[in-house]
Structure formats: structure tokens, C-alpha cells
């Protein structure tokens, strides 16, 4: 032992000096996780040999195991040694990987083991109890040092951030000027926060004036007159991102050729316009048939620094609607800002949508300040109304009173030359002026939604049969958006209900999982039907025939590797026509099981029995059903029909699809509905005008698998059969609803 001390006596003073200077051996070997304790701690718990033992062990990295030939063990206290036993020369070796892993695992569970636990560990690992004790002491010291270093770094960064913010405030105060007279601001007459807000408001007004002129220049229109009431302020080093409250939005996600500050300021101006459009009354909005009408002259006076004059080539549509929906404000904002959820929520209006670029994700934990570039295609459930395709910014902001606002605004030509390739509004036929909604929190999980739709669109391709509906705002206006939102919120509330109806109307549905799976399958069926009716580009349909008002549009597509559709060649046939009866009467007739055999070839004259029923809202017409057709010519039937009926003030739907019995049993047991093949058919029923008291516009659409081989060639006979089927169905419906006693033609089998 003396020889060991002699060999290293020159190291001991320097190490002790380091200890007195406040340094720890741990700082020299921070990369090692298994060091022995500091000298002071060791000395207090041993007889003086422990510090020298630790010195020797620290030379080898702190993971050495000290062993002795004596019974006391190396590094132990003098009281643990047998005085009659002849001491033997101690030897060292590193802790094994197994020992280190076991010690680390135990430390995670218990960083302060008692004497009994240390002895148990020593027996299991072949170490001395004092070695185990020293290891835990060192480990705790190391963890404490790392934690303190991390805290110090965080506090230092926070301190620097506060210093920088304080410096910015001082500079702003030094350069502050009155927004009205341009002289020094009288800070003493107002609070600091009020002064800061006034300064920000004045600067934002100036920026909005500037962006209005630039935006008008980009779209080739003369700039609006800039109001002289807000003189320009001195230039600021703050980015427009700061004015929007967008954190961490410095990444160049729009490309080098794109004026990103211009886009951000466009979003700010759109948000201000939306809020005022939603809150102002007369004379900006005047009462009109079926809602409110926008006063164009008052709009031009109210927003002189808006997005430029309206295009004479496009027709202006403006509408506003308010409703209270059964969804909390946080969930509603989340669904509007997630493109997938937004598309599913408004599947009858939005045939496709995508997020092209994200400029900001907003504040962590919510979407306050989120800004993204999106594209979407809006649709009407008729082949006689072309879809509207557009690219727009979507900006979300929470206002000081707690109200959330989500605004859309078209980019028009501002993105020309960049990767997105936006075209002018006139070329696309659709321009989205500031549109969106204000969302206010209400008690009991409800939200008050005020929706504003303000667009310019080319309606030249709209058929005369549907122009009254389109021009009244029933097709793409705020009333339809809000009515759809109300109905879908009730549907989601029904889907999330955990209880299964006990009154017997649930039928074969016995679990909440089966209920949710069936609703999810019906949701996909409705989305597929709506997209197919309008020949949306999402579903890759190709028109083969159809030009007149009641002509049948026949479209085809090949289904390959799509678990939601059967493989092969699928034909879709759709037509729209007018009926001289109210929409409610048409809806009740088509969803009535007792009259289904009068028009449905699938029933084939059999009796239709409802096997399951799920109510989807307050209106008894909103429901999902599972039907079974009992054919009189057979003892049992394998034909099941999934059907969803939905109705609101702007339209109604009866959509159905035959489903396989085995696949449906899986769904009813809570299985995945995405792998159930569906080909939906059905009806879309719209009022023929804004008052809703006249006739109905009915669209009939079928999807039929004509060949199970995707590579097969489409035969003219298949097209003729589908044409005959839809023509026969139309004639039968007309005869049944209008009371025509004429004999309807037989439908093809």
C-alpha cells in the first residue's frame, strides 16, 4: 500500500488543491458516468485510505473496481478490517458492463439506496458495499451537476432574451411619434401597454395601405387611393412576422422568387377585413330574401384599402350566416386548420384540398398565428354546375377577447413566377376575397360561428336550371357552409356517443365500436358519392357522353389497388332534372322503405327491412341505416344495403351502396371499415330557389362495376345498359312523385 502512495505522492497535493479551489474530479472526467465520490465525501466516510483509493481509481476513468485479498475489501473503513489479518496488496479492475448496467438500472428506480439495498447489490454484482455506496454518491453528484448546468444555460438564455426585448422597448419609446400629428407621443398620459398598442396599430395601418397598392399592381389594376389620415411612420427593424404574432416563421418556405412579406401582409389585411365584415351591420349588410345582401358601394367605402377593385369579368357573391353548433371552439379550430379533417367535415362542398406550403404552425399547443397556402376544389352535387378551383392563404388568429378567426384569401397573381404557379383570378374563374368565420366559445361545449363568404366567380358555364340557386348563394354561400357545419357537428357528436340505444332502434348494432365503424363507413360512402356526381378531378373521371339538361353524363375510371372499391372498370352515370314538388316531399319519398321498390332495381320487388338505425341529429331525417332486401323468390337474402340520409336548409341526400354480408359483420363488430369495397349511388335534392317553397332539383347518380378486370376494354353495351338504368329510374321517380299514371319503362336487369 505504501508503494502505491509513493508512486503517486506527487499527484495528491495538486488534486487536494483543486478540491479547495471548488473544482471536482467529476469535471475532469465528465464523459464517464461511473466515478467515485469527491474527496471530501470519501474522507468523511472512511479512515483515510478511501481518498487514496479514489485517486488511483480516478486515473483509470472512474469505473475501476478495487479489490483486496483481505477480508475487509479495498476502500473500506478501518473498522471493517481484521487487525490480525495480514494485509495484501490491492489490485484494480474496471467495473464490468453488466455491473454498470445493473447499477444504472437500479439508480433509475432508486437513486438513494439504503444500507440493506447496497449490500444486496454488492452481493449480486460481486462488489464491496462501500464501492456501491461510492458509485451512487458519484452518480448523484454527476446528475446534480448536469442539471445545474442545464438550468444555468436556460436562465442565461432567458436573461439575454429579456434584455433584448427590454432594449427593443426602449428604442421604440425613444422613436415614438403621434400617429395623428407626427410629434412626440405623450407617454405620460397613457400606460405603456396602451402606448405600445397604439404604435402597433398605426404601423399596421400604414403597412395595409402599402400592401393594398402593391397587390393592386400585381393583379394589373389601379391602386386604391391611400388614405392620408395615417402618415407613414419611420422604418422599423421588426419583421411583418412579428406584427402577426407568428413565432419562428423565418424559414424561406416560399422560395427565393416569392415576396413572402407581401403575402404575410396580405393575410393581415384579410383578417382585419373578415372581422369587420362579420361584425358590422347596416348599411354594409342589408336584409334580403333568404339572408343578407352586401352593399357594394358601402363595401368600397368601408374598405378603401382592400384587395383592389373587383374584376368585371367575374360575378360577385357575398353572404353571411350565424349559428350555434355543438362543438367546442378548440376542436372546431383544429378541424378547420387540418386539411384532412376540413375536407371530411365539408365533403359535400370540398371535393379535394391540399396544403401546399406552411409558413407558420402558430404558437405551440394551438393554431394562433398559423398561416398556410392551400388549394381546394369546391363542388355542387350536380354535373350541370362546374367545380370551382382556387389557391388561397388560410390564416388563423386568436383575438384578445378570446374569439378565434380563420380567414381565406386568394393569392391571385402574387405567386406568379414561383413554384406554385398561381394564375390571375379571371384565368381561373374564381377569386376568394377575405372569407371565413369567427368562432366564439359558448357554455356546455358549444360554439357560436359567424361565417362570411365573399368570392368572385365565373358562372357562364352554370346551366340555366341551376343559376337561381348559384346566384342566391345557396350553392356556395355562407348559408350552405353553416348548414353543413351544423349537421356535421351533430353527426360527430352522435359518432362519439359511447352508449348504444336501448330502445331497439339500433338493431344489430350491439357495441359502441360497431356503431363508430358503421358511421365511418357511411362517411366514406357519402364523400365518394359527392365527388363522383360532379366529375371531380380528384376521382379521375372521364366524361364519355352528355350535353343537355337531362342528358346522362357517363364517366368511367379504372380501380386498381384501392381497398375501398372493387377492382375493375367502374361506370358512373349522373343526371339532373327539375320536379314540380317541394324538396321535403322528394326526400321523404326516396328514404321511405315501403316505397323503395317503386324505383330501386336493387330491391327487385322484394320487401326492404331495416336491420340497424343510427340517428345523426335533431332532424329525424338525418340517419344511417342498414337495410336487408328479402326477395320473395328465395328463402334468405344475402343483399345488404348501407344507406345514409341527411338534410338541412340548403339540400338533402339519400346515398346508399350494396355491401357484402361478411364484410358488414366485421364492421358491426368494430372492425376496420376502410377495407370494405363500396360503390355508392343515390340522390341529391336541392330547392330550385332561395325561398325553398317551389320545386326541386334532383340529381341521380349510379356507380356500377361493369368488368372486374381493370385492363379490359369498355364495351358499348355496358354504357348503353347504365344509360338505360338511370333513364328508367328517373322515369319511375317522376311517375311516382308527380302522380303520373303513365306506365314507367321496365328497368334493365
Curated annotation (Swiss-Prot):
InterPro entries, per database record: GLABRA2/ANL2/PDF2/ATML1-like, HD, Homeobox_CS, Homeodomain-like_sf, START-like_dom_sf, START_lipid-bd_dom
DNA-binding region(s) from the entry: 88-147
Basic and acidic residues: bias regions: 46-57
Major location category of this protein: nucleus
Chloroplast recorded as keyword: no
One Pfam family per UniProt: START
Keywords attached to this entry: Coiled coil, DNA-binding, Homeobox, Nucleus, Transcription, Transcription regulation
Biased composition annotated in UniProt, kind: Basic residues: 86-97
UniProt keyword Amino-acid biosynthesis present: no
GO molecular function: DNA binding; DNA-binding transcription factor activity, RNA polymerase II-specific; lipid binding
Region Disordered, annotated ranges: 26-98
Coiled coil segments of this chain: 137-218
Protein's cellular compartments: Nucleus
Domain START: 256-494
GO CC field: nucleus
Species assigned in the record: Oryza sativa subsp. japonica (Rice)
Protein name: Homeobox-leucine zipper protein ROC7
Gene3D superfamilies reported for this sequence: 3.30.530.20, Homeodomain-like
SMART domains reported in the protein's UniProt record: HOX, START
Family statement: Belongs to the HD-ZIP homeobox family. Class IV subfamily.
Biological role stated in the UniProt entry: Probable transcription factor.
Biased composition (Gly residues): 68-79
